[in-house]
């Protein structure tokens, strides 16, 4: 299994710079993105998409692209002061 973590520092700008081609080249099973800041549409038919965006538009946010469906998905820690920033997604696999 290949897992990649990428701080994209704004997914919309990263997408314009070839994000999708880079993801294809990496051939990762799971791609974890931080600081996505937006929910710009991604055409990734080979990946399931799990988004956790901040309540404040244009701020923080995370995205996980996964080739296999997880057993469970957790968004946040259950602490409102932290979860409003969209900083955590946990996927659980067997």
Where in this protein do the model-derived segments appear?
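Structured beta-strand-rich core segments of catalytic domains in phosphoester-bond hydrolases
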Residues: 37, 42-94
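N-terminal, active-site-proximal structural segment of metallo-dependent hydrolase catalytic domains
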Residues: 1-44, 54-59, 75
């Amino acid at each position: 299994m290949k897992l990649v973590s990428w701080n994209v520092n704004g997914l919309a700008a990263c997408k314009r710079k070839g994000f999708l081609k880079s993801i294809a080249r990496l051939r990762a099973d799971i791609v974890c993105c931080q600081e996505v800041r937006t929910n710009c549409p991604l055409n990734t038919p080979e990946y399931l998409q799990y988004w956790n965006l901040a309540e404040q538009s244009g701020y923080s946010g995370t995205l996980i692209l996964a080739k296999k469906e997880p057993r469970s998905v957790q968004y946040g820690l259950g602490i409102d002061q932290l979860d409003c920033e969209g900083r955590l997604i946990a996927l659980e696999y067997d």
